[in-house]
UniProtKB/Swiss-Prot annotation:
Gene3D superfamilies: Queuine tRNA-ribosyltransferase-like. The lineage of its organism: Bacteria, Pseudomonadati, Pseudomonadota, Alphaproteobacteria, Rickettsiales. It holds the Pfam family TGT. This is Queuine tRNA-ribosyltransferase. Binds 1 zinc ion per subunit. Belongs to the queuine tRNA-ribosyltransferase family.
Length: 361
């Protein structure tokens, strides 16, 4: 079995392109991970997700621990077998979802106690339990348990939260079962404070994670402030390990983050937007519900190879979405995921050529 490794093949300014080698295959970076929250990328077959060019997808610890349970998935052979996906899977730690429960959860040094949003049952999610769940799922890349610092946060609030994340990172690392081809990423926090981001990175580097994520962004701070943090945060992380910006997926945000040294991304934007009738193209977004597309015989994008563009007109997609047909959500999602994977492919090409990225080529 291959060992987990990251090799940078090309670098242009701060942007890097390379290959992550894992037990479940290679990941070309910069990489975009479609979100498969409950063991499925909504409105897509796993083989269709692979056809879009995706090398890896994301699963959600919080949702899978509730339904059908990590133990059941393990009994059935692990998440890869369960959902028929042979490529790498990264699972988040569940921390972000639990923190977003607000009134339903309580944070202590031990972990987070919360009530299920499904039936009200009480759970305790700790660094050890989160790591165990991800092991039971068979995750290729496990995320350390963290507290996602809310925005805005004062310096003291962000410091207290960051220090808790550091202590939880130690416990997550101790609980992680090391195996060839598998990895665990630590998550740096610190809100929008450079001093805290630097300290968080220093603390986590001591634990020698296989990769590092930048958490606590895309939580309402806006692109300008996010880029300001990304001007320095990736530089605090090891050059020879993958850097993952969690929850970021607007094309302009991805391009800006890649140019600042980020390698991996995930976001629900392409799938959620597709289900809501919004398509991404090189020339901007298309709201297919708009009546101006009712008699438009052209495809969404003439040079796109996805089934929606190769076989159907904007008029047909407009019709499907307006009447709420499931096929509309499927085709729009397929197109958006194809667009995002094509975007990542073009970004990798531009890095290899040593050129600044152009959206429209």
């Amino acid at each position: 079995m291959s060992k987990f490794s990251f090799n940078i093949n090309h670098q242009y300014k701060k942007a890097r392109s390379g290959i992550i080698t894992t037990a479940h295959g290679n990941i070309r970076t910069p990489a975009f991970m479609p979100v498969g929250t409950r063991g499925t990328v909504k409105a897509m077959l796993p083989e269709s997700v692979a056809e879009t060019g995706a090398d890896i997808l994301l699963g959600n610890t919080y949702h899978l621990m509730l339904q059908p349970s990590a133990e059941r998935i393990a009994k059935l052979g692990g998440l890869h077998k369960f959902m028929n996906w042979g490529k790498p899977i990264l699972t988040d730690s569940g921390g972000f979802q639990v923190m977003s429960l607000s009134k339903l959860r309580k944070i202590t040094e031990e972990g987070v106690s919360f009530n299920s949003h499904i039936n009200g049952d009480k759970y305790l999610l700790t660094p050890e339990r989160s790591t165990e769940i991800q092991h039971l799922l068979g995750s290729t890349i496990t995320m350390a348990f963290d507290e996602c610092t809310p925005y805005p946060a004062t310096f003291e609030e962000a410091k207290t939260s960051m220090q808790l994340t550091t202590r939880w990172a130690h416990r997550s690392r101790e609980a992680f079962v090391k195996r060839d081809g598998y990895a665990q990423f630590g998550i740096i926090q610190g809100s929008t404070y450079e001093e805290l981001r630097e300290q968080s990175a220093k603390d986590l580097i001591e634990l020698d994670f296989e990769g590092y994520a930048i958490g606590g962004l895309a939580v309402g701070e806006g692109q300008e402030l996010m880029f300001k943090v990304l001007d320095y945060a990736p530089d605090f992380l090891p050059q020879n390990k993958p850097r993952y910006l969690m929850g970021v997926g607007k094309p302009a945000d991805i391009i800006g983050a890649v140019s600042r040294g980020v390698d991996m991304f995930d976001c629900v934007i392409p799938t959620r937007s597709g289900r809501n009738g919004q398509a991404f193209t090189k020339y901007g977004t298309v709201n297919i519900r708009n009546s101006k597309y009712a008699e438009d015989n052209d495809p969404l994008e003439a040079d796109c190879l996805c089934p929606a563009c190769q076989n159907y007109s904007k008029a047909y997609l407009h019709h499907l979405v307006r009447i709420g047909e499931i096929l509309g959500a499927m085709l729009m999602t397929w197109h958006n995921l194809t667009y995002f994977q094509n975007l990542m492919s073009r970004i990798r090409e531009y890095i290899a050529l040593g050129k600044d990225f152009d959206f429209t080529t």
